Amino acid sequence: MVWNVAILGATGVVGQRFIQLLYNHPWFKIEVLAASEKSAGKSFGKVCNWTLESEMPREVAEMQVVNSDVKSVEKAGNIDFVFSALPSEIAGPVEEEFAKKYPVFSKASSHRLEEDAPLLVPEVNPEHLELVKIQKERRNWDGFISTDPNCSTIQLVITLKPLMQFGLKKVIVSTMQALSGAGFPGVSSLSIIDNVLPYISGEEEKIELETLKILGNLDDGKIQPASIKVSASCNRVNVKDGHLECVFVELERSVSVEDVKEAFRNFKGEPQTLKLPSAPENPIIVREEEDRPQPRFDRNEGKGMSVVVGRIRRDNVLTIKYLCLSHNTIRGAA
């Protein structure tokens, strides 16, 4: 069976990734492309500044863009699912209107921390999808909203999940985040050349709060946040794609570096068990070289869906430290 999907915010960087990953997908067919009112009524190829490394599919280029409202989308085609890449400042009410009738999978931050909305990383917390039933009953919707975490949170929690068996207590993370994470046109060249920007608005708070929800337990229809402490510092660096994070963790148990490497290598999630089409064979890849991972060499591992970990060491202050890298607009966004 193939499901028809609408992509909201299709002309942006995340919307383009949705198109790239859903075009020719065995389960989904792109039925409707929606964007802003100024783009509506025009062909996608004329209004989209395509920034990805692959060519824009000709069939997609010829599709007519519609406005991002339920009436316009329904008029353009019959849909089963909605993928939302809308900016967070407008996503909230628009997604809620669609969710009254359709399943909505959102990249925006608008609904991430709502108590009845799953904040989902499929390898980490698939059981949180139980919230969908509660959400539909509470809001009297036929559809629902499931949210996707911040790009820098996703790769972090994928690496933290296998460490929870050792008793996770504290996490300190410092990020070096790629330019594409700021969207297009993004950061001005004069601001980033020969420079590092030591502040990304709202990013640290997202990591600290989202991590607790994702790693929390579903109990009696509510998420009980994980009882760990998370501290984040975020920086924008002059790299096109691929977020690199320095992670320091305190564990309850005394573990060796080899214990941690083995936990990373053996980690599999529900997508791997089900052999889902977009799931990487290995959600975490361990590199042994002293100077890896690096964005240029490692961001496309697992077709951009794997998290690459390296420099795993004992830490003199906490327990273990390591670096992790992931493609921020593939695993991290779409």
Placement of each model-derived feature along the sequence:
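N-terminal Rossmann-like NAD(P) cofactor-binding subdomain of oxidoreductases
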Residues: M1-Y199, K229, Q272-L276, P283, ...
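Charged docking surfaces used in two-component/phosphorelay signaling
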Residues: S180-A334
